[in-house]
Amino acid sequence: MPIVDSGSVSPLSDAEKNKIRAAWDIVYKNYEKNGVDILVKFFTGTPAAQAFFPKFKGLTTADALKKSSDVRWHAERIINAVNDAVKSMDDTEKMSMKLQELSVKHAQSFYVDRQYFKVLAGIIADTTAPGDAGFEKLMSMICILLSSAY
């Protein structure tokens, strides 16, 4: 299933949740490195997205991005937000509240273009569980909630 950022998706089945947890546990064990790798891949593949991050100005190479403490800090925030969503799969109300709060911040304080949530979600999905429909469904849920304040 392709990742979507509007509408709705069907609830995750228990089997999908178990598969997501197993795949995510592997990625999250090394969350600092994997988070940075994901964010670097995002910025090198989508350089226009850096415009929303003034602290990242001038970081034009993968090596420069990886060495930046600001990039590492933001990568950790992203990976931990996904981890919170994975941990909240059985409590979608909790997941919704956290992600809707992030949506408001990104829409009203940071003015991030919501199209980038879907791009980043695709990179996270490809890194964690390439081609897995359940993980893509979770990423869709996250994108839909992150787009809710737009």
Curated annotation (Swiss-Prot):
Q: Is Metal-binding one of the keywords?
A: yes
Q: Which UniProt keywords apply?
A: Heme, Iron, Metal-binding, Oxygen transport, Transport
The family database entries (PROSITE patterns) matched by this protein are listed as: GLOBIN
Q: Identify the domain of life.
A: Eukaryota
Q: Does the keyword Transport apply?
A: yes
**What GO molecular function terms would the record report?**
heme binding; iron ion binding; oxidoreductase activity; oxygen binding; oxygen carrier activity
Q: Which residues form the Globin domain?
A: 11-150
Q: Where does heme b bind?
A: 74, 106
> What InterPro entries does this protein's entry cite?
Globin, Globin-like_sf, Globin/Proto, Globin_lamprey/hagfish
Q: How does it assemble?
A: Monomer.
Instruction: Give the similarity note.
Output: Belongs to the globin family.
Name the record gives this protein? Globin-2
- The species this protein belongs to is Mordacia mordax (Southern hemisphere lamprey)
